[in-house]
Amino acid sequence: MRHRHGLRKLNRTSSHRLAMLRNMTVSLLRHEAIKTTLPKAKELRRVIEPILTLGKTDSLANKRLAFNRLRDREMVVKLFAELGPRYANRNGGYLRILKMGFRVGDNAPMAFVELVDRPDTTEAVEDNSGE
């Protein structure tokens, strides 16, 4: 029986699943928005929300925990310098998952995952082109 097992296996071994979710977490922190399948997006939310909560408290122990989960020094620096202060007053709910329809090849449900309260880059582009 599968009762009370909340983990999605995503048809992968545990090491592949861990590596995939770690890579997706680093990509989301780097670009602040990614496109993926809906089940992967929902599982990514379970991984990245506690990491973003770690970034709100700047301590050596939290930095070591974040590095242990991310394995990317540049993203740990961004997490504590930029993202932690941005979400200091928000208690969870750091991600927005938007459904995007279905993938052409296999009809898999797709999702757009982005960090909430991310700065708009389109306004800066429009301001530069107007000058």
UniProtKB/Swiss-Prot annotation:
**Which GO terms fall under biological process for this protein?**
translation
The cross-references to PROSITE patterns, in alphabetical order and at most eight, read: RIBOSOMAL_L17 (PS01167)
Write down the Gene3D superfamilies for this protein, in alphabetical order.
Ribosomal protein L17 (3.90.1030.10)
Q: Name one Pfam family in it.
A: Ribosomal_L17
Family label: Belongs to the bacterial ribosomal protein bL17 family.
Binding partners and assembly: Part of the 50S ribosomal subunit. Contacts protein L32.
Name the record gives this protein? Large ribosomal subunit protein bL17
Per the UniProt record, the source organism is Janthinobacterium sp. (strain Marseille) (Minibacterium massiliensis)
Q: Which gene encodes it?
A: rplQ
